[in-house]
């Protein structure tokens, strides 16, 4: 099924696990941490000609990106987070986003992904 580019963009983000381990050792390694998701976002930002780097904890990095606009006098700061809460209680596959009755379901779909 074909979706609008913005919906597919969000589906691609949801499909990348970025679970905050919250100090727990029972979170599977393939979903714990934000590194894969941060790398994906960084590459998308670079594709938009922004300078983007990962900083901080290698497994739970932050992204710092900067765009210079000729003649601009104002600064815009966008602050968000990359992690999601654990998926223990989800009844659907949290990283296989589905659309049902016009709503998108998946971990992070109603947060900052």
Region spans (language model):
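Acidic/His- and Gly-rich active-site-bordering loop/insert found
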Residues: 2-110
């Amino acid at each position: 099924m074909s979706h609008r580019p913005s919906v597919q963009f969000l589906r691609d983000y949801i499909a990348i696990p970025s679970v905050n381990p919250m100090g727990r050792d029972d979170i599977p390694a393939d979903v714990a941490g934000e590194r894969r998701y941060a790398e994906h976002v960084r590459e998308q930002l670079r594709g938009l000609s922004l300078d983007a780097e990962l900083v901080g904890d290698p497994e739970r990095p932050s992204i710092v990106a900067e765009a210079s606009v000729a003649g601009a006098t104002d600064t815009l700061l966008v602050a968000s987070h990359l992690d999601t809460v654990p998926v223990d209680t989800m009844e659907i596959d949290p990283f296989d986003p589905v659309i049902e009755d016009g709503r998108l379901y998946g971990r992070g779909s109603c947060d900052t992904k």
